[in-house]
Amino acid sequence: MHQPYDVTIIGGGPVGLFTAFYSGMRQMKTKVIESLPQLGGQLATLYPEKYIYDIAGFPKVKAQDLVDRLLEQANEFDPTYVLGETVLAYERLDDGLIRLVTNKGEHYTKTVILTAGNGSFAARPLGVADAERFEGSNLHYFVNEMDRFKDRQVVLLGGGDSAVDWSLMLEPIAKSVTLVHRRDKFRAHEHTVELLHNSSVNVMTPYTLESVTGEDSIETLTFKHAETDEVIVVGADDVVCNFGFVSSLGPLKEWEVEFERNSIRVNSKMETAIPGVFACGDIATYDGRVKLIATGFGEAPIAVNQAKLLVDPSARHPQHSTSLFEKVKNH
């Protein structure tokens, strides 16, 4: 059997990366297992060009830039990254170690920290006839490269933060931006909705999508007013569907932890119902928790410090980062 790790972090999103950094500061041998072929979670996969506004110290930061900073930070302590593997099951061994079984092999660890966010995810489809045949051309479910929309007529559908944020970000780049929502009110943050209404974005509410037409790509979209049945046909060079994502925790649902909807109940120490298994970030829940990256950043050190005590009961209480970081780097 290979030498076990002190902690194995399941999930390589922003909270998982910060957890890896902090466990490195606590001089723990650290492994990160990520089911996607790249680190960064939804930020890197779905929203790399999107700005984030609620990270302390950054008035705004592009998602990919935040991921790059987190990777640079975590890599100070050379954690082991395992990409493209999905954890299927765990087993407590007689010697107290935890054996993690993935779709490609086995991993041995003393503790586990779950930072899998909302789990695996898939975009909710556009939901009209023949739409799927345009998914390889000009129907998009997320925006990876802003420049591809330069000087083009872009129609976005949705009423949440992503739809509003992308509309505002594409406004100075695209030839025109139209945002269509089936309700009168948007679910996005109040401030960004105010920015939307003060922008040049053409806002259409409450309209539902009836059909799309086109040969090799979507050329027109037909909308019906939800109250008056008025029909409007809108031309488009690109269509961005922001109806959200369906997420699943997959095999984690079989673990002997307490679930609350799609999250795992933890206590104030980030402990789950399984000894030695902790959770932080959006996969964790407790009374009053707010689903923000910033919240997960605060939970990560709690989980790591508790895991450290299990690995080494004689470990001292963590010091401030300045003295701790210098001590570890000079070790």
From Swiss-Prot:
Reactions catalysed: 2 reduced [2Fe-2S]-[ferredoxin] + NADP(+) + H(+) = 2 oxidized [2Fe-2S]-[ferredoxin] + NADPH
Binding site for FAD: 34, 42, 47, 87, 121, 282, 322
Top-level EC class as recorded in UniProt: oxidoreductase
UniProt keyword terms in alphabetical order: FAD, Flavoprotein, NADP, Oxidoreductase
Cofactor: FAD
Molecular-function annotations in GO: ferredoxin-NADP+ reductase activity; flavin adenine dinucleotide binding; NADP binding
Family indicated by similarity: Belongs to the ferredoxin--NADP reductase type 2 family.
Record-given protein name: Ferredoxin--NADP reductase 1
Organism: Exiguobacterium sibiricum (strain DSM 17290 / CCUG 55495 / CIP 109462 / JCM 13490 / 255-15)
Lineage: Bacteria, Bacillati, Bacillota, Bacilli, Bacillales
